[in-house]
């Protein structure tokens, strides 16, 4: 165990990370309505990614970051304030977007619907935008290369998926998609 684990700033980073993953690992699955199964290969890749990423984030925060970097003054730094605002804005956007998707269908309905509420008015993958915003906030609030790498991995994973969703929506719903972008409002 790191001797730094209870330093206030580092402990705060740890709590932020744990809030995200507690919700994603324990709460989110309980909220899902469908009975579809996830392929073992996809699940295994997710587990591997999270093990590697968790190791990388923890190694930086608890061991490699300079001991003078995350002192109490960090809480009032622009990095921490802006990063925290983005992190939680992204988290809440992600949760709201997931809620909207989960409530598109009534029980027994199997049709696809185009989400119309929240950030879905601007992009077809609002949940992905929230996730990207969240990890951009993480990269800023930790001001770390490991946070930046995590953000890059998130973008590299979610932007192509957002493009596939946008193309599928265009094919299925045509002009109803309107001017919505894929994942970044007003941009892409």
Residue ranges and their predicted role:
Residues 30-58, 65-69, 109-113:
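Functional transmembrane or membrane-interface alpha-helices that line membrane-embedded catalytic
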Residues 1-49, 188:
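Membrane-helix and juxtamembrane interface regions of eukaryotic multi-pass membrane proteins
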Residues 35-36, 62, 137, 143:
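Hydrophobic alpha-helical membrane context
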Residues 56-60, 94-97:
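C-terminal TM-helix exit segments that contain a strictly Trp-centered aromatic cap at the helix terminus
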Residues 25-30, 55-56, 161-168:
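Juxtamembrane membrane-interface segments at transmembrane alpha-helix termini
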Residues 1-6, 49, 68-188:
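Hydrophobic transmembrane alpha-helices
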